[in-house]
Amino acid sequence: SKYIEYPEFEEYISKRINGEWTAKVNELKTRLLRGKEIAEQINILGDDGVPVEYHVIFWKSEVIDYVILQQDAFDEVDAVTPMERQEDILNLVVDICRAEYKFDGFLEVMDYFKKLINLCKQMNYAEFKSEKFEDYKRQIREMVAERQ
């Protein structure tokens, strides 16, 4: 969104949420762009033609896309996301993206991140702060910790 570029908006968000919000959003925007660039390289060079780290960067951008940018308009919970929930999910996705992962090959990366995205999507369907929501969040954090 262009709003994030305006100082007035940043000031408003800093008061309404916190001072780190715009920096985190900009970080995720940069990761999305980097993921798109890497997707193009993978398409040209093939999966084996790029380092495993490139696949990790690409799949981190997919997490951002699937978990934050895509919403299910037909789901009562996911259709409308209050600010507190947005902040919580954004922080979780930032943590996922900042984590360093260890993989032996690109297929391992793909399988891992598909499972992680699925858990995140299931969390998006759960009522915020419910037992189910918190359980999904715990599973996600455990899954991230296992690969570090």
Where is each model-derived feature located?
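Conserved catalytic/coupling modules of large nucleotide/cofactor-utilizing molecular machines
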Residues: 1-148
